[in-house]
Amino acid sequence: MKHLVTTALAYTNGPLHLGHARSTYIPADIYTRYLRLKGEEVIHVGGTDNHGVPITLTAEREGVKPIDIVDRYHNAIKADLDSLNVSFDTFGRTHSDIHIETAQEFYSKLKENGYIYEKEIEQFYCEKCDMYLADRYVEGICPFCEGEARGDHCEVCGRHLEPTELVNPYCIHCNSKPEIKRTTHYFFKLSAMQDVLKEYIENSPEMPEHVKNMALRWIEELHDWDVSRNIKWGVPIPGCDDQVMYVWIEAPIGYVSFTKQLGDLWKDYWLENTGDSKISHFIGKDITVHHAVFWPGILKGIGGYKMPNAVVSGGYLTLENKKMSTSKNWVVWVKDFIENFSSDYLRYFFMINAPLNRDTDFSWDDFQKRINTELIDIIGNFTHRTLVFTERKFGSTPVVDLNQLKDEDKKLISKCEDTLNRVDSLIREYNFKDALMEIIHLAKEGNGYFQGMAPWAIKDEERLKEVMYTCSVALKYIVYLLSSFMPEKTALLLEYMNEELDLEVRGNPLKKPKVIFTKVSDEDISRMKENLMKATKKAETKSDEKSKKVKSGEKMDIIDIDYFGNIDLRVGQILEVEEVPRSKKLYKITADLGDEKRQIVSGLKGAYEAEELVGKKVIIICNLKPAKLCGVESQGMLLAAEDDSIVSLLALDRDLPVGSKIH
């Protein structure tokens, strides 16, 4: 059987961090290396995703073209992957002729097959910039937690948002308030695929169970999918001058277009009726639905393509038990890690720390402990003492009469063969943690055998040869099985053993071994922790400076008196104050405006006790568009001033009746 292994396309808006490495790239490389080790035909396809709003935003901030950002980070990402010893047979980019042509062919075929249609939608439009605003071009206040949020996501509370849900939205280019207009977008009729996709998922025996369950839940409520965007940077929609394909319809097509870079070979892996092949997609958990539902839907809509056999979804990675954040620099970049430690140590730690489908944490202390007390004290100990003792006593691996081996020798060799079979099954099931545990257990058995045989005390040279031959067999199996996980260290071991990467022990002359596995020192860990805190502090300083600029009004536009006159400001009096459920900041306030009572949601909790507010006369904006905060409708806004942690309601210096207008 042929194997096609793909990794999620890295987005060219920044370099890789440890989360990317753990969920996707390291496990995919281990799987590919193992299949190749077993003599199976496999190609590993990877590349970068180069389109979409975040790239255009970065380019605009830096005053360069989007292609400049793409080129920079495509090269940086490839360098990061090389440093992790993640290798590919083909590595492409979506901003290339072959990809754009392939993506447009897919789109046209979907349209020809009746799966693309036009539909009017509501979208923010900026009059000042004369453009429709994609989700990342709009920012405002999260309606759930009152944090600053983007049009698609609130980083404070983690919720997915629609741009039109934002409170006080503004265009990120000019800071003016956008209006909602109707525009025509193109939709993929994904809802028509419900039965087909359900059958596909239920009849995919190699699909991991947690992926199946997630996909089936989504398929139950399948909706059509908006697949166009009003931006210029992307794959142009055929026959449309002002919209491009949404990245999540065109980026997965990269798996096909990048395989095409290998020539006609691509057909054997992707087209139906071209032989037996297996497709495995390695991805992060956050894009499971895109690969298990949307992408198969596209392939079904095109027709004639093989379907993915497995979507291998890696869990989230936290850092020191906190969610990673690139904007806050609470992250460890691959480049920074590799400058200080072997990539093999990272590959080992991530695969042994937790099953791939589970979320896990990267802690510098745990990393040190795992490497020193597990990898080095068990595997490193057995490999080093076997090589050193054998080289010193014999200069080469002993050749013995296998019929003369004792039961205890045969027991360890039998353990090697059992481990080989178990590791094979586990890796093919994408169970990398348990596969690695089997190798560790074999090394433990080897250490126990070495210690029990006490070769330093054996006087009979033939018996000593049998013992060290048995240790060398175990060593060869460990190196063979470990090679997919730790290619650098095992290559060094093979060099000292003067052996090939197979299971045969040839009796070759040994090279004088050096220490291969070196411990991670306390000084190393202290330095990395300190670097992390410095980077985070630097990001906090930048964030504080940005907040001060906003507070000082540096971003505000000049307005005329007529504009100000449109704001209905009146004196109100607070009658009742209640806490808003699930919110740490919000009160639900009932205010008297003279001719009516209003419900207002305000973030004064923590600054004022509820009883302090009752009876206060305040200034209220009365003609603000109603908005929901944490599910509670707010029909106005109380005015307050803020400086760092101090919040103060605006008050009158003379008593005026409620309802009085402010000019």
UniProtKB/Swiss-Prot annotation:
Record EC number: 6.1.1.10
GO cellular component: aminoacyl-tRNA synthetase multienzyme complex; cytosol
GO biological process: methionyl-tRNA aminoacylation
Keywords: Aminoacyl-tRNA synthetase, ATP-binding, Cytoplasm, Ligase, Metal-binding, Nucleotide-binding, Protein biosynthesis, RNA-binding, tRNA-binding, Zinc
Keyword DNA-binding in annotation: no
Motif ('KMSKS' region) on chain: 323-327
Function: Is required not only for elongation of protein synthesis but also for the initiation of all mRNA translation through initiator tRNA(fMet) aminoacylation.
Protein name according to UniProt: Methionine--tRNA ligase
Source species: Methanococcus maripaludis (strain C5 / ATCC BAA-1333)
Encoding gene per record: metG
